[in-house]
UniProtKB/Swiss-Prot annotation:
GO terms for biological process: reductive pentose-phosphate cycle. The keyword Chloroplast applies. Keywords: Calvin cycle, Carbohydrate metabolism, Chloroplast, Disulfide bond, Hydrolase, Magnesium, Metal-binding, Plastid, Transit peptide. GO terms for cellular component: chloroplast stroma. It comes from Brassica napus. Induction: Light activation through pH changes, Mg(2+) levels and also by light-modulated reduction of essential disulfide groups via the ferredoxin-thioredoxin f system. The lineage of its organism: Eukaryota, Viridiplantae, Streptophyta, Embryophyta, Tracheophyta. This is Fructose-1,6-bisphosphatase, chloroplastic. Homotetramer. Its EC number is 3.1.3.11.
Length: 411
C-alpha cells in the first residue's frame, strides 16, 4: 500500500512498509539505548523496511516488586490485629474471642462513663464490697457488663473480679475455659469529678478444675476452694494483660507477652484502632507519682527517698510530682513519659492498698514487656504467689532505673 502524499513523517513508523524510511526528513530514534549499535537482521528485520514486532524481555533482568504505598486512610483495628496474631501462631482462636469480648465490655463501659451524669450513674450504690469499700453505682454496673461479656464469649471458665467475694465458675463455657481476672472500673472515686478512670484485666491459661461437675456431691465451699486455688496464680503465668483508660480519648493497651500495643477508640467507626506499636518505657524519668497526703504514715526510708527526689541536686532540677488518683491514668502517663508510680504500705494499710491479682500483676506484666519493672519494694511483683483473691501488696512500678533506685532505699 503506497503512502499518501499527505502522510506525515511519523506515519512511516506506524505502517508495515517495504519502502525506505529514509524518506523521512529526520529519522527518529525509538530506542535510544540501541543508538549507534549494529542490530543483526533476521527474519523479522528487512533491509528495505521496519516491521513492528514484540520484543521479548531479557530473562536475566531482575524485576523488583513495587513498594506498597501505605494509604493515609488505612486503619488496623484491634480485631484485625488479633487475627494477624492468630495467623502467626501467637494466640489461638479461643483467646482471640476472649480478647474481643473484653474489648466489647470496655466500649460499653466507656459509653456509660461518658454519660454517667446524664444517666444518673454518679454517686454511691449504697452497698459495700468485699474490701469494705463503698461501691459506686458505676462499679456495680461495670462489673455486670464485664461479667456478661465474658460469659457470652463461651470461652471463659472462671472469672474473678474486685467486686465479687469469690471467683465465679462460668457454666456457659463451650471451650477455652480461660481464667480472667479484672477490676471493672479502677479509680471510680473520680467519676463524679469526670477524672480519668479505667478497667484492668489479666488472662491465665485454661483450667477445668473449677467447672461445675454433675457428679460432684461435695459442698459448695469445696468447689469455691478449688476455684480460689486455680485463680491464685503468680503473674508469671499470665498469657495476656491490659487496661482500658477512659479519658479525653478511650485507649486500650494490650500485651500478649511480646511487646505492648495501644489502640484508640475511633468514635466514628466504633472500633479500637492501632495507634502505638511496641511501646517502650524510658529507662529513667524525672516524674514521681505518689499520694503525698500519706507521707507522715510512711516508712522512714521511703520518706528519705521522696525527700531526695525533691532535692534539686547538682542538676538544679528536682523531680516533678504528678498524681491523678487513678492507677490506670497514673500508670499510662508513666508508661509513656517514664518515672515511677508508687502506692506503698503505711500505718493504716499495713500490706498496701492495691490488689495483687487483678491490679498489680497485670500492670507489672505490661510494664516489663515495655522494658520497665514492677516491685513491692523488695521482690518482683510477677514472682509473688497470691494466697487469696483480694490480697493487697505495695506497688512501685515504672522505669527500671527508677524502681531499682527506690529498692536500694528500702533494702
Amino acid at each position: 500500500m503506497a503512502a499518501t502524499a499527505g502522510a506525515t513523517p511519523s506515519s512511516h513508523l506506524l505502517l508495515s512498509s517495504s519502502r525506505h524510511v529514509a524518506a523521512s526528513p529526520q529519522p527518529r530514534i525509538l530506542f535510544p539505548s540501541l543508538s549507534g549499535k549494529r542490530v543483526a537482521v533476521g527474519k523479522n528485520h528487512h533491509a528495505t523496511g521496519v516491521r513492528c514486532m514484540a520484543v521479548a524481555a531479557d530473562a536475566t533482568a531482575e524485576t523488583k516488586p513495587a513498594a506498597k504505598k501505605k494509604s493515609g486512610y488505612e486503619l488496623q483495628t484491634l480485631t484485625s490485629w488479633l487475627l494477624r496474631q492468630e495467623m502467626k501462631g501467637e494466640i489461638d482462636t479461643e483467646l482471640t474471642i476472649v480478647m474481643s469480648s473484653i474489648a466489647m465490655a470496655c466500649k460499653q463501659i466507656a459509653s456509660l462513663v461518658q454519660r454517667a451524669g446524664i444517666s444518673n450513674l454518679t454517686g454511691v450504690q449504697g452497698a459495700v464490697n468485699i474490701q469494705g469499700e463503698d461501691q459506686k453505682k458505676l462499679d456495680v454496673v461495670s462489673n455486670e457488663v464485664f461479667s456478661n461479656c465474658l460469659r457470652s464469649s463461651g470461652r471463659t471458665g472462671i472469672i474473678a473480679s474486685e467486686e465479687e467475694d469469690v471467683p465465679v465458675a462460668v457454666e456457659e463455657s463451650y471451650s477455652g475455659n480461660y481464667v480472667v481476672v479484672f477490676d471493672p472500673l479502677d479509680g471510680s472515686s473520680n467519676i463524679d469529678a469526670a477524672v480519668s478512670t479505667g478497667s484492668i484485666f489479666g488472662i491465665y491459661s485454661p483450667n477445668d478444675e473449677c467447672l461445675p461437675d454433675s457428679d460432684d456431691t461435695s459442698a459448695l465451699g469445696s468447689e469455691e476452694e478449688r476455684c480460689i486455688v486455680n485463680v491464685c496464680q503468680p503473674g508469671n503465668n499470665l498469657l495476656a494483660a491490659g487496661y482500658c483508660m477512659y479519658s479525653s480519648s478511650v485507649i486500650f493497651v494490650l500485651t500478649l507477652g511480646k511487646g505492648v500495643f495501644a489502640f484508640t477508640l475511633d468514635p466514628m467507626y466504633g472500633e479500637f484502632v492501632l495507634t502505638q506499636e511496641n511501646i517502650e518505657i524510658p529507662k529513667a524519668g524525672k516524674i514521681y507519682s505518689f499520694n503525698e497526703g500519706n507521707y507522715q504514715m510512711w516508712d522512714e526510708n521511703l520518706k528519705k527517698y521522696i525527700d531526695d527526689l525533691k532535692d534539686p541536686g547538682p542538676s538544679g532540677k528536682p523531680y516533678s510530682a504528678r498524681y491523678i488518683g487513678s492507677l490506670v491514668g497514673d500508670f499510662h502517663r508513666t508508661l509513656l513519659y517514664g518515672g515511677i508510680y508508687g502506692y506503698p504500705r503505711d500505718a493504716k494499710s499495713k500490706n498496701g492498698k492495691l490488689r495483687l491479682l487483678y491490679e498489680c500483676a497485670p500492670m507489672s506484666f505490661i510494664v516489663e514487656q515495655a522494658g520497665g519493672k514492677g516491685s513491692d519494694g523488695h521482690h518482683r511483683v510477677l514472682d509473688i504467689q497470691p494466697t487469696e483473691i483480694h490480697q493487697r501488696v505495695p506497688l512501685y512500678i515504672g522505669s527500671k532505673e527508677e524502681v531499682e533506685k527506690l529498692e536500694k532505699y528500702l533494702a
